[in-house]
Amino acid sequence: MFYSEAILSKKGPLAKVWLAAHWEKKLSKVQTLHTSIEQSVHAIVTEETAPMALRLSGQLMLGVVRIYSRKARYLLEDCTEALMRLKMSFQPGQVDMIEPATALQSLKGKDAVTQSANLTLPETITEFDLLVPDSTFDFQWSQLLRTPSRSSNTLELHSLPISSSPSFPSSQLSIEAGRNAQVESGFSLGESFAHVGNDMQFHLPISNSGAATPRSVHSDNQSQISIEVGRDAPAAAATDLSGIIGPQMTKSPASSVTHFSTPSMLPIGGTSLDDELLAPVDDLNLDLGLDDLLGDEQGANAPAIEADEQAETSSIHLPSDIMEDDSSRPAAAGVEEGQVVESATAPQQEKINPQKTVRRQRAIIDPVTELSSKQMKKQLADTSSITSPLCLNTSSIVFNATVNFTRNGKFNTSIFSSNLNPKVNELLQADFKQAILRKRKNESPEEVEPAKHQRTDTSTENQETAEVLDPEEIAAAELANITEAAIATLPQETVVQPEGEAPELGSPMGFPVTALESADDSLFDAPPVMLDEADLLGSERLDSSVSEALPSSQTAKDSLRNKWDPYTEGEKVSFQTLSAGCNREEAVQLFFDVLVLATKDVISVKQDVAIQNEITLTAKRGMLLSSL
């Protein structure tokens, strides 16, 4: 097959299309993406290059479909890759940092805006910036509890919780505190020293005092840990500086030095922070003359200081989260630490304890696992439950009709259309070949040389009659002339059967004798010189007419099956029942079918003289089979 130059060329709208239709694997991704489907389809439809056959255009369309499929697959892969990159870029904690050396090299030649956008600041936050901020002694409640974003929620002083430290929800706390972040709660002095002892590894004799010091900025019942301490670490003990500073720290000072600065509102135990820090100054026994000065300042400024304190603490702004936390907190605030620890470790113990696996039920074993010998013998003796009656006639009526419809001449009507030419339908008949063979057989004696000795008294009338009549017409006429009266008048002769052959069903049983039996045997036994050409032709016609009068075994069986289709061997039916509703010719033909099948041992025939010579037919094994 020759292709045009447009198809076999390396360039053009049809170059890659033809290659994709035959060798798709040889096309690369670039060649596939650069192929224009619109131009290729336009070239195929319009046939600009050369007229193409239907097969060639179909192959080119196949190539177009394959190129389109590969383009769609490439597009899907690109979209999937882009989507995965977007998902990976938005993952929490994923930052794509570029290397410094490669960044400077890649940024050469770009504008200043792109360079400034890609620059990153160095990390200047160190470990020392994450420590607890230094405590100042001039904190006020208004500074600690004021929230700018939620200033509308006001809380009166009498509605504050009784706890020694304010309560904050755990969601507002962070382990790492910012540099300029506001202090979210008050810190006790003992707690601050406890952290110093833990961080600097100072073995200080810190013990619990009677003062209740807060261990955390939370107020819930669970054990919470301060900043820079492990989440699940044991609770730090409350600190008391009485052992370090001296026993004089515990006694309340006569004159407080807190008047040097603004009074602190952070409660630590029963005393204030300033009193505990500056208490040793009173015990130094130094007569500096400051008592009078402090006494005068205290006496003069005492009412003003108390008024300022009342103004600051009368209206305190708290976030709404604190209000909800305080309202939902149980009334019993003084819970022992042992109960808190148990409640905190209870969920962990539940997680550690494995769940009990449900045991599967064991399979129940049958008590009887073997059959007894008596039961086995009983089953062998009685097999009615496992056997069924033998039915050799497995073929149905529809199957038999399908197998034998060619013999009935219905093959053409079921295969070809009804408007077929009659002459063509005649040629397609199943018996057309048989008719040709019979015609050749009848014409063959004319070609044979005549006998040497011929009789001189041959009559021309017999020859003219033989030439005019057709063998088929003769057989049909002889079959039509057979009537009951003709059958009764046929001569009945006793035929001697050789040994080993089946007995012929002749006149002893009352059956009529066929034309073959009534023919004169002298015609066949006479020497050839006694027969002329007309007699020889007449004998052959007689043989053919008799053979046509007697149906074949399969035809007789099929004809009988149309009226009687037994299912089991030994099934019986009477001839009067089969011939009921038949005319005279059909009854004679049915009788001949019965005779033929009886000679082939397909059925057995019996005539009962006691019951008005009734003929009974019994089916044998051959009748149950589909073919003989």
From Swiss-Prot:
Protein name per UniProt: Cohesin subunit rad21
Subunit field text: Cohesin complexes are composed of the psm1/smc1 and psm3/smc3 heterodimer attached via their hinge domain, rad21/scc1 which link them, and psc3/scc3, which interacts with rad21. Interacts with ssl3.
Molecular function GO labels: chromatin binding
Modified residue annotations for Phosphoserine: S219, S547, S553
Family from the record: Belongs to the rad21 family.
Function: Cleavable component of the cohesin complex, involved in chromosome cohesion during cell cycle. The cohesin complex is required for the cohesion of sister chromatids after DNA replication. The cohesin complex apparently forms a large proteinaceous ring within which sister chromatids can be trapped. At metaphase-anaphase transition, this protein is cleaved by cut1 and dissociates from chromatin, allowing sister chromatids to segregate. Also involved in the DNA double-strand-break (DSB) repair system.
Biased composition (Basic and acidic residues): 449-458
Site (Cleavage): R179, N180, R231, D232
Substitution effect: R231E: Sister chromatid separation blocked
Compartments (UniProt record): Nucleus; Chromosome, Centromere
Record InterPro entries: Rad21/Rec8-like (IPR039781), Rad21/Rec8_C_eu (IPR006909), Rad21_Rec8_N (IPR006910), ScpA-like_C (IPR023093), WH_DNA-bd_sf (IPR036390)
Chain residue ranges for the region called Disordered: 439-466
GO biological process: cell division; chromatin looping; DNA damage response; double-strand break repair; homologous chromosome segregation; mitotic sister chromatid cohesion; mitotic sister chromatid segregation; mitotic telomere tethering at nuclear periphery
PANTHER family: FI11703P (PTHR12585:SF69), SCC1 / RAD21 FAMILY MEMBER (PTHR12585)
Organism the protein comes from: Schizosaccharomyces pombe (strain 972 / ATCC 24843) (Fission yeast)
Keyword flag Transit peptide: no
Keywords: Cell cycle, Cell division, Centromere, Chromosome, Chromosome partition, DNA damage, DNA repair, Mitosis, Nucleus, Phosphoprotein
Superkingdom in the source lineage: Eukaryota
One Gene Ontology CC term in the entry: rDNA heterochromatin
Post-translational modification as stated in the protein's UniProt record: Hyperphosphorylated during S and G2 phases. Proteolytic cleavage of a fraction of hyperphosphorylated form at the onset of anaphase may be essential for the proper progression of anaphase and sister chromatid separation.
Keyword Nucleus among record annotations: yes
